[in-house]
Regions:
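Short, well-ordered coil/turn segments that N-cap beta-strands
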Residues: 31-33, 56, 89-93, 130-132, ...
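Non-cysteine beta-strand/loop elements that form the S-adenosyl-L-methionine
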Residues: 57-63, 96, 137-139, 207-216
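Conserved beta-strand positions
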Residues: 60, 131, 136, 184, ...
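Glycan-binding loop/region signatures in secreted carbohydrate-active enzymes
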Residues: 97, 259-335, 361-374
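Short acidic, glycine/proline-enriched helix-loop-strand junctions
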Residues: 145, 149-158, 305-306, 353-374
Length: 374
């Protein structure tokens, strides 16, 4: 990491002996919550210096599992990340492992020897590239979602893996005198939430990212894919997921509300009820980036608010589009502040080129001004 006014070597630069010049610290806006940004590995990460004050933590996605160990040999943008973190020393760099459809967790964690091998490899990869934390994104223990292998013992093995990582991170903290964090990504559906013992999980992790998106979109009935509150006949929502976790004993101050930087599109939708909860010709499989959502009204779409769900949608050209805008982001920022959450986690940078959603969210988390006399 970088301290203003000092020249440090870290991660790849340290390995290759190239010094990194630290810049003067940028002014950081005050926020009532932590902003975590998932950055997917690709040749151009799309990170600009003007985004940096709005980011507290980058989760670099993803290390994959090969032969029972964490592997980053496929990474193309790691040098860019190194440089970015070196220039902006206030940002924590966290290694995310797994992701949707990532195979190998169940087999690797099936035995004590396998779990130790995997945990040790994750920590080695973290150390090699100068990350200061680990985010485990196993989607999902005990489930064959996306066709991955699973077994009945996965949930217990997941906790056991987290315990080994916690032990290794704590040991590094003692030896090196700095904090190392452990995070998990959690599904927001009832089936995924049922596997979580919040009290047990809270004793192991510093952060839990609730992936409160893709809640709808896999059938032909339109709806909010990332609504804050339930709507229609489905309970799935960000608030539902967070409340389920806190009810199970997870401290709200460890929870990050997941926010999508993309919308979902259903095609050939009737105008009844302004398109909401209507049958479409397609499922909501097509996605639009945040900057594309911002252009919809100029293309003839009409924007609508669902006050019950605190969600936004657009209807136009026969299409129904569910996604975020300033109003829905502000509602989520207000809610997570009022409920004592740690903050928000945005998936993902490549869907928010230029950082408009990131900056809007950061602004929405700014402390409310104190009125005279308060």
């Amino acid at each position: 990491m970088v301290v203003a006014g000092m020249t440090l070597t870290t991660g790849l630069s340290a390995l290759q002996g190239d010094p990194v010049e630290a810049e003067e610290a940028l002014p950081l806006p005050a926020r009532d919550g932590r902003v975590v940004l998932y950055v997917m590995d690709q040749p151009d990460l799309g990170l600009t210096d003007d985004m940096a004050p709005h980011i507290d933590q980058i989760n670099y996605a993803f290390a994959l599992l090969e032969g029972g160990e964490a592997d980053g040999s496929h990474w193309q943008g790691i040098r860019q990340l190194e440089g970015y973190l070196a220039r902006h020393g206030h940002i924590d760099g966290v290694l995310s492992v797994g992701g949707w459809g990532a195979e190998g967790f169940s087999d690797a964690c099936a035995t004590a020897e396998g779990r130790k091998r995997l945990a040790d490899s994750i920590l080695r990869l973290m150390d090699r590239y100068g990350f200061t934390g680990v985010d485990i994104d196993w989607e999902y223990p005990g489930s064959s979602a996306a066709g991955i292998k699973s077994r009945e013992e996965d949930v217990d093995n997941w906790y056991a893996l987290l315990a080994l990582l916690r032990q290794g991170l704590d040991q590094r903290q003692t030896e090196r005198g700095r904090d190392y964090l452990l995070s998990v990504a959690l599904g927001a559906g009832a089936e995924q939430l049922a596997m979580v013992d919040g009290e047990r999980l809270g004793g192991l992790v510093d952060q839990a990212v609730v992936m409160a998106y893709d809640l709808q979109g896999f059938d032909r009935i339109t709806g909010h894919h990332a609504g804050l509150y339930p709507a229609g006949d489905t309970p799935n929502s960000g608030a539902f997921a967070v409340n389920a976790l806190t009810d199970s004993g997870l401290f709200a101050g460890k929870i990050l509300l997941g926010i999508p930087a993309y919308g979902r599109v259903w095609r050939q939708v009737s105008g009844d009820n302004d398109g909401l909860h209507q049958r479409a010709a397609t499922a909501g499989n097509r996605t639009l980036r945040y900057d594309e959502l911002q252009q919809l009204e100029s293309q003839g779409y009409t924007r609508h608010d669902d006050e019950e769900a605190q969600a936004t949608w657009w209807l136009g050209c026969g299409n129904f589009v569910s996604g975020e805008d300033e109003a829905s982001l502000t509602a989520k920022a207000d809610w997570l502040r009022e409920n004592g959450l740690l903050g928000a986690a945005v998936w993902a940078q490549h869907q928010d080129p230029g950082g408009a959603l990131l900056m809007t969210l950061s602004g929405a988390l700014a402390p409310s001004p104190v009125a005279d006399g308060d």
